[in-house]
Every structure is written in C-alpha cells, then in structure tokens.
UniProtKB/Swiss-Prot annotation:
Reversibly transfers an adenylyl group from ATP to 4'-phosphopantetheine, yielding dephospho-CoA (dPCoA) and pyrophosphate. Its cofactor is Mg(2+). This is Phosphopantetheine adenylyltransferase. ATP binds at residues 9-10, 17, 88-90, 98, 123-129.
C-alpha cells in the first residue's frame, strides 16, 4: 500500500486541484490531501473553511482523505506514512520553486519521493489567485471551480470577512 500526500493551500480548491487528485488517487492506494495552514500567505479562506471546501469537492473519492496541517511537510508526511509527495506543475514558472522544494524535501525526507503532475490542458492556467480576483470583481468562475466552491466564494465576498483565523 503506497500512501501519497498532496499538500497545498487550496485557497480555493479549483478544478485543477481536483484534476490532480483524480489522477493521483488512481496511482496510489491512499492519497492524503494536506491543507496547509500557511498563515504567512494570508489566505482568503480560513483553514477550516478550506478543509470543508476540499471535503465537499472530494467526498466521492474512497481513497482520499482531507486533513489540515501546520508545520513542516516532512512531519506531516511522516505522520501519515507517506512514501510520495504529489505536486502540480502548471507552467515553467512553477518549476524552479517546486524543484527547490523537492530538493529540500529530499534532504529532510530521503526516503520520500516527489512526483510532479501537470494538470490537464484545460486547467493549466488556473490559479487560486486568479479565481479569487475574478470572483471578487463579480466575474464568472464556474469554469474554474465547482458550484459548491463558487457558492463559498460568493458568500465570503458578500460577508466581507477575508483572512479568517
């Protein structure tokens, strides 16, 4: 049984994220989606909101668990007995950062591999930042996020409460 972790901020959880989960969950016996606290990024949604959103989108996957975490990824991976870290690469601009992160993770966790997956063509340009910006200006984000996520975005924007927690 090979366990993999797919860490990220997921702010918000997009169709691109789900695409990677769908594909990674077909490779590994168990996939743990690790929703990172990442307070330094000042997330739009609070940690519990991001966990709840991801659970709504991914609830139909039987071998996928959504778990929040703070601290080092190495500790999270060890806690879940993960052998692989899954990361998405949308563009060449992602590669340098992800390559450095993979090197650091290999140093900290020599027995854990990093697997890079590229999103399906229709999702290569999607980012949480773009989705939040479009939604905050009243634009249509239905092609980028699932209806439940769009609902969360609309409610959050209407409430004016960002960066909770």
């Amino acid at each position: 049984m090979t366990v993999a972790v797919y860490p990220g901020t997921f702010d918000p959880f997009t169709r691109g994220h789900e695409d990677l989960v769908r594909r990674a969950s077909s490779i590994f016996s168990e996939l743990i989606v690790g929703v990172a606290d990442s307070r330094s990024k000042r997330p739009f949604f609070g940690l519990q909101e991001r966990i709840d959103i991801a659970k709504e989108v991914l609830g139909h996957y039987h071998n996928v668990k959504v778990v929040g975490f703070s601290g080092l990824l190495k500790d999270f991976a060890r806690e879940h007995n993960a052998r692989v870290i899954v990361r998405g690469l949308r563009a060449v601009s992602d590669f340098e950062y992800e390559f450095q992160m993979a090197g650091m993770n290999r140093y900290l966790l020599p027995d854990v591999e990093t697997l890079f997956l590229t999103p399906s063509d229709q999702y290569q340009f999607i980012s949480g930042t773009f989705v939040r910006e479009i939604a905050s200006m009243g634009g249509d984000v239905s092609k980028f996020v699932f209806p439940s996520v769009e609902k969360w975005l609309v409610q959050k924007i209407a409430s004016g409460t960002q960066h909770s927690e």
